[in-house]
Structures are given as structure tokens and as C-alpha cells.
């Protein structure tokens, strides 16, 4: 038996499609949204549509931005000769919070996972290799320490080694299987400072 009206059930169903949101959390969010003032709901809906329509990939590093170049790639104060490779834009934000990394990034938007059918062509490796045609001294691989992250790191290392560009991997300290988004800034900073050559 369905306890809710079709509109509430549909809202719960749509919210539960979001990552990390189960049916109970979706229900709480749905009722919160329904009880919000109409203007706030309209603003939320407009913001979602606006973000979806205007956010795109930075033409250089592939992070999400609303401009052609993200603020990091557009900055002349950043070290454009050092590129940190991360799985997604959330991990870029995690490293930025340390305030200690002054290079630029490359966002893969995924990791190699044969079990899930994700191969090298499914992530942004082509764009990374194109960037390496420019003036780059070092690539820091900061993918997750999961099996997929390690597989991706080794694959990238093998691609880059023939170019003569220095390749390093963030140090451990980031727990195996740990999600970088939830690692504190000090641990991330130590992992970055203790990176090793591959």
C-alpha cells in the first residue's frame, strides 16, 4: 500500500536517485521541500536547472565550471608545469582546502574498472595526454587508493613514463579504500608531501 500521494511518491523516487540518498533520506528531504516556502522551492528548482544548463567541463583540466576555463587553470599564479591527476572534481576541492598545493589539476571523471566495464577510453586520459604535449615537469597521480584508483595510477604511469615527465604518486596515509572526499586536510597534505616516484 502506498502511503503517500503520487506527487510525494514521485518526489521521493527522484530524490532517492541521488548518490548517498536512500528511501528514508529521500522521504525526509521530500517533506522538507514540500514544507519550504514556495519562493525557496522555486529558487531551488531554478538553481538546479541553471546549474545543469550552464556548468560544463573546463577545456583544460576537465573539472566542472561555468566558464571556458576554471579559476585554477585561468590563474597566472598557479604552477602550470605541475599537474595533479584526480578522479573527480570533489577530490580537487579536497586538495584545494589544504591551501598548500599551487599546481593545476586534471580531472579524470572516473577510474579504470574492468569489473564495471570502465576502460581507459571511458575516462579523460586522452585530454591528459594532450596536455602533456605542453611544458609540464611533473604529474602527481592522486587517484583513490582503491583497486580502481591503483589500477588507474599504474596505467597513467605507464603512459607518461616514455615522455620523460616526472611521475609521482601520493603517499600512503590515505587509507586503502578510503574516499578522498572524506579525508581531513592534514592527512591529504602529508600524502601529497610524501608522494613517491613511479
What residue spans do the PLM features occupy?
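Cys/His-rich Zn2+-binding cysteine-cluster or related metal-binding knuckle/ribbon modules and their
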Residues: 2-8, 17, 30-83, 88-92
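S-adenosyl-L-methionine-dependent methyltransferase catalytic core, i.e., the SAM/SAH-binding region
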Residues: 8-17, 27, 33-36, 76, ...
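Signal for well-folded cores of large energy- and translation-related assemblies
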Residues: 16, 34, 49, 62, ...
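Conserved phosphate/pyrophosphate-binding and hydrolysis machinery centered on Walker-type P-loop NTPases
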Residues: 19, 38, 51, 63, ...
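Extended interfacial segments that mediate partner engagement and assembly in macromolecular machines
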Residues: 26, 75-143
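Residue-level signal for pocket-adjacent positions within structured domains
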Residues: 28, 43, 56, 68, ...
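Long C-terminal interaction/binding lobes of large macromolecular proteins
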Residues: 129-198
Amino acid at each position: 500500500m502506498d502511503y503517500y500521494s503520487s506527487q510525494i511518491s514521485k518526489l521521493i523516487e527522484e530524490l532517492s536517485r541521488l548518490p548517498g540518498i536512500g528511501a528514508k533520506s529521500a522521504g525526509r528531504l521530500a517533506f522538507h521541500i514540500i514544507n519550504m516556502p514556495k519562493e525557496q522551492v522555486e529558487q531551488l528548482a531554478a538553481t538546479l536547472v541553471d546549474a545543469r544548463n550552464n556548468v560544463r567541463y573546463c577545456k583544460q583540466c576537465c573539472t566542472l565550471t561555468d566558464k571556458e576555463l576554471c579559476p585554477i587553470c585561468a590563474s597566472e599564479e598557479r604552477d602550470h608545469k605541475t599537474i595533479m591527476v584526480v578522479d573527480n572534481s570533489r577530490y580537487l576541492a579536497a586538495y584545494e582546502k589544504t591551501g598548500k598545493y599551487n599546481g593545476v589539476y586534471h580531472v579524470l571523471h572516473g577510474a579504470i574498472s574492468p569489473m564495471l566495464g570502465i576502460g581507459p577510453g571511458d575516462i579523460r586520459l586522452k585530454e591528459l595526454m594532450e596536455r602533456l604535449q605542453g611544458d609540464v615537469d611533473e604529474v602527481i597521480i592522486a587517484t583513490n587508493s582503491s583497486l580502481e584508483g591503483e589500477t588507474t595510477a599504474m596505467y597513467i604511469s605507464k603512459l607518461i613514463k616514455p615522455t620523460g615527465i616526472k611521475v609521482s604518486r601520493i603517499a600512503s596515509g590515505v587509507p586503502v579504500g578510503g574516499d578522498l572526499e572524506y579525508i581531513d586536510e592534514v592527512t591529504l597534505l602529508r600524502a601529497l608531501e610524501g608522494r613517491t616516484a613511479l
